[in-house]
Amino acid sequence: MISRVLYRPFDESDFEPCTQIVQDAWHKDSGNEVYNFFEAAADFSYCLSVSTFSQVAVVDGRVCGIVLARTGKRNMKTSDHWAQVEHDIIQQMQQIEPELTDRYLTFIKTQVRINNWLIEQCPQTPPDEITLLAVSSSTRGLGVGSVLLDAACSHVTNQGGTSAYLFTDTDCSYKFYEHRGFKRAAARKANLNERFCSLPRESFLYTLDLNA
């Protein structure tokens, strides 16, 4: 049976299914599933707060993928809304699992530092970023991820951009981006302290020439 796939902008009603996709991909280490969901929700809320473009994939009526990108100026009302959502979720995380929340915040702080280091290694880093690409495991192989990524790149081009970048790592399917034409511009291996904070073995910055 051929699946029916619809692509459209993100709606707030998509928040829970998109968070579930993010959780299944990157937030399942804790034995507390409620905490895992909150952690994924905080991560996803942050991505929404820094993004200006969204596209979700709906397969047979079910949200199965999302891409976010950042180009130009953000709508500060929308950005502030999602930043507040992230803040509120982290407060809930601290109430149910304070130690895990502290560990998560340390992870985020360390990841930001590593990302900033990667950017420093690439003085010509483009201003436009693919901030998130996540697809449900149940629909991988249908080409959903490729269509979503192409939509984000087309948006960057339509906004006048000529290249884009993204962060990825060894905990992600980074080879996918290479197959889509992205080039590795910088890499950094995690040290022992960073690995203790659950950082991936190696982090990367990839860029894509949209004129190629």
Model-derived segments and spans:
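Active-site rim helix/loop that mediates acceptor-substrate recognition in acyltransferases
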Residues: 32-60, 64, 68, 89-92, ...
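Conserved beta-strand-loop-alpha-helix junction that forms the acyl-donor binding cleft
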Residues: 131-140, 165-175, 191-194
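Conserved active-site alpha-helix within GNAT-family acetyltransferase domains
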Residues: 116, 146, 170-187
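A short beta-loop-alpha structural element at the N-terminal edge
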Residues: 4-20, 71-72
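Conserved acyl-donor/pantetheine-binding loop and adjacent beta-alpha core of acyl/acetyltransferases
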Residues: 73-128, 192-199
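Helix-loop element at the rim of GNAT/NAT acetyltransferase active sites that forms part
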Residues: 20-36, 45-46, 71-76
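Conserved acetyl-CoA-binding loop-helix of GNAT-fold acetyltransferases
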Residues: 135, 141-154, 179
